[in-house]
Curated annotation (Swiss-Prot):
<dbReference type="GO" id="GO:0005758">
    <property type="term" value="C:mitochondrial intermembrane space"/>
</dbReference>
<feature type="region of interest" description="N-terminal SAM-like domain">
    <location>
        <begin position="1"/>
        <end position="185"/>
    </location>
</feature>
<protein>
    <recommendedName>
        <fullName>Fe-S cluster assembly protein DRE2</fullName>
    </recommendedName>
</protein>
<keyword id="KW-0496">Mitochondrion</keyword>
<feature type="compositionally biased region" description="Acidic residues">
    <location>
        <begin position="188"/>
        <end position="206"/>
    </location>
</feature>
<feature type="binding site">
    <location>
        <position position="322"/>
    </location>
    <ligand>
        <name>[4Fe-4S] cluster</name>
    </ligand>
</feature>
<dbReference type="InterPro" id="IPR007785">
    <property type="entry name" value="Anamorsin"/>
</dbReference>
<dbReference type="GO" id="GO:0009055">
    <property type="term" value="F:electron transfer activity"/>
</dbReference>
<feature type="binding site">
    <location>
        <position position="259"/>
    </location>
    <ligand>
        <name>[2Fe-2S] cluster</name>
    </ligand>
</feature>
<dbReference type="InterPro" id="IPR046408">
    <property type="entry name" value="CIAPIN1"/>
</dbReference>
<keyword id="KW-0004">4Fe-4S</keyword>
<feature type="binding site">
    <location>
        <position position="262"/>
    </location>
    <ligand>
        <name>[2Fe-2S] cluster</name>
    </ligand>
</feature>
<keyword id="KW-0963">Cytoplasm</keyword>
<keyword id="KW-0411">Iron-sulfur</keyword>
<feature type="binding site">
    <location>
        <position position="264"/>
    </location>
    <ligand>
        <name>[2Fe-2S] cluster</name>
    </ligand>
</feature>
<dbReference type="GO" id="GO:0016226">
    <property type="term" value="P:iron-sulfur cluster assembly"/>
</dbReference>
<feature type="region of interest" description="Disordered">
    <location>
        <begin position="162"/>
        <end position="213"/>
    </location>
</feature>
Length: 348
């Protein structure tokens, strides 16, 4: 069983349409020394429908119609094929596109030779034995009995820790009550008499300046108070309002409109003004509007010898008249016939 060489032929699904290609590959020199050949579709292996045994095959061949640079192969199957190959097993059919995956999974890439490009799994076939120097035996005592090794008893002394000293109690910080600003100023003045004299001189100068300023503004205020002018005198008579507001005699308030129960005469004055305005309107608008015969007659002179309506359809009736025709509501008439508008004079 150990001398039997098993091979695996993985077939691309597109190759099933050309069975003669599969037979020609089986008869090639690659499978010449194979005693057993297994044949599976690569998609069956990809979907785990077929499980491969570990280290069973010495040769795996992938048959695909694709070009070498366009091969599409599931990268996860490279590890599966590496596990199913024996040490020194060969894998044909893949290209340098998957070279990195081959190196990761323990393959060596072979580019030269009669068999062409293929991968070889690293294993016992390529390992070489190396001599190893053994440790010389120890001389035993004359008695020939082996003595047990003697081990010194370790000492597990616990580490000693020194008790930390307690910190000495410290009292609470004491705070000195601050002195009043006045007292500190007095103390400083007592200590430094020259500085006090300088400050007194500055204070006296500032007091004199303040007194002079107040005197100046008092003089200005006195002049303004002596020459004050009434604000009403600054308004010209022409700028005064021409509206006279009548004060109601009962409520003693200024009103533009008379009260409901006014007895001061404002209500009567307003009524008199309203009557005068109404009478003026009646005089202007009360005159009746009268039209002469020429104004009441609309004649079209576009057709000589024949008189028709102004719009050309006025004589046909309301169905044919425009919305602004003055003959709306009148019966139809003959073109050129004078029409009197006396019937609608009241509406005008």
């Amino acid at each position: 069983m150990s001398g039997e060489k098993s091979s695996l032929l993985l077939i691309h699904p597109a190759v099933t349409t050309t069975p003669e290609l599969v037979e020609s590959v089986k008869k090639s020199n690659v499978f010449a020394d194979s005693s057993k050949l297994d044949q599976f579709l690569v998609n069956k292996l990809n979907d785990s429908s077929v499980q491969l045994e570990d280290e069973k095959y010495s040769l795996v061949y992938y048959l695909t119609p694709e070009k070498e640079s366009e091969i599409q192969f599931p990268t996860k199957l490279i590890a599966v094929l590496a596990q199913s190959l024996r040490g020194g097993g060969r894998l044909f059919g893949l290209s340098d596109v998957y070279k990195i995956d081959a190196l990761i999974n323990g393959f060596e890439v072979v580019n030269s030779g009669e068999q062409g490009y293929h991968w070889v799994k690293k294993g016992t076939a390529h390992t070489q034995t190396a001599p190893v120097a053994l440790r010389p035996k120890r001389n035993t005592p004359s008695g020939g009995s082996k003595s047990l090794p003697i081990f010194a008893k370790p000492s597990f002394a616990l580490p000693a820790f020194k008790k930390a000293e307690k910190p000495k109690p410290t009292g609470l910080p004491t705070f000195k009550k601050p002195e009043s600003p006045r007292a500190s100023v007095v103390a400083e003045d007592l200590d430094d008499g020259d500085e006090l004299d300088g400050m007194n001189e500055d204070d006296s100068n500032s007091d004199e300046l303040t007194a002079s300023k107040s005197k100046f503004f008092d003089d200005v205020a006195g002049q303004d108070s002596a020459d004050s002018i009434d604000e009403d005198d600054l308004v010209d008579d022409a700028e005064k309002s021409a509206i006279t507001v009548v004060t109601c005699g009962k409520t003693k308030t200024r009103r533009r409109k008379a009260c409901k129960d006014c007895t001061c005469g404002l209500k009567e004055a307003e009524a008199q003004e309203a009557d005068a305005a109404r009478a003026a309107q009646d005089r202007i608008l009360g005159k009746p509007v009268k039209f002469d015969e020429q104004e009441l007659t609309e004649i079209d002179f576009t057709i000589q010898g024949k008189k028709v309506g102004g719009c050309g359809s006025c004589s046909l009736g309301d169905a044919f008249r425009c919305s602004g025709c003055p003959y709306l509501g009148l019966p139809a008439f003959k073109p050129g016939q004078p029409i009197s508008l006396d019937t609608i004079a009241d509406d005008l």
